[in-house]
Amino acid sequence: MSAEILLILVIALLLDRVLGDPDWLWSRLTHPVVFFGKAVEYVDEALNRGEFTKAWLKFRGVVGILVLLAGATALGVVLARLFDVLGALGSLLEVVTVAVFLAQKSLADHVSRVAAGLRRDGLAGGREAVSMIVGRDPNTLDEPAVCRAAIESLAENFSDGVVAPAFWYAVAGLPGLLAYKMLNTADSMIGHKSPKYLHFGWASARLDDLANLPAARLSALLIAAGAYFRRGAEAAKTAIEVARRDHGLHRSPNSGWPEAAMAGATGVQLAGPRIYGGVKVDEPMMNDAGRAVAAIEDIEAAVTVFYAACSVMTFAFAAAALPLLLF
């Protein structure tokens, strides 16, 4: 963790906060994550075919994810060395590269569209907007469930779309950032428990859990800090208490931390029973002392907490860089 890396990260966070993922750019260019997805598809098609034993499928899945991670890491090393040779221009290109893999503004924009859709077009508008960011069947959601889904998506993706990429870049530079994004892409594509991927995707899912472990805990603390600045000390205290108590109620070992913290920060109940691909997932509600009926205003409150949490994180990285720059 060098001063240069931290400084680049801070500037990249600010750039992503302002510009996000502009449609005019990515309608003309292919986003790097799309290439990562194509690499995952290639490995899936090459290794996950035919009839194999469970153990052999797991082994092939381990080989597949290691190949993908090695490729992403090697690309990160090449880019880091190239940018280093290019001097100031290279630093600028590295800022842009890091910003591309962050999701502050794009995430907040997607979640805010759910609130806007509900206000403009009622339940149909909210369902359409939330279907862009969650995997559950939107037609099974009433308005409070749409609001909960949006808030849960915001909290979970704060961890793996903002905090985790920033964390791994700070720790391991571009190789760490690209390896994390490849792993996270693989987990989203092959890390689920469908019959096809239960064994082949096992290694990707477990490694993703491990890689997100520090970021998930940091996300809960950052959400509590954001709640402190936007909603007061009591909201921050509740966010910490609910995160510590209820994170284990979630089926994911990591997602429960930011979601429970956001439930406490906004004062609403989150999680609970929901339907994915026609299959009902029964989970208890997080923050069972909170309001049972989430509303549009709760989405908007969550977005303000999210942005405050992002600001706290950016300030923390800047504060960490300062003594390294001075001494």
UniProtKB/Swiss-Prot annotation:
Sequence intervals crossing the membrane: 63-83, 84-104, 158-178, 305-325
Pathway the protein acts in: Cofactor biosynthesis; adenosylcobalamin biosynthesis
Domain of life: Bacteria
One Pfam short name: CobD_Cbib
Keywords, ordered alphabetically: Cell membrane, Cobalamin biosynthesis, Membrane, Transmembrane, Transmembrane helix
One Gene Ontology term, aspect cellular component: plasma membrane
Function, as annotated: Converts cobyric acid to cobinamide by the addition of aminopropanol on the F carboxylic group.
Protein name: Cobalamin biosynthesis protein CobD
Origin species: Rhizobium meliloti (strain 1021) (Ensifer meliloti)
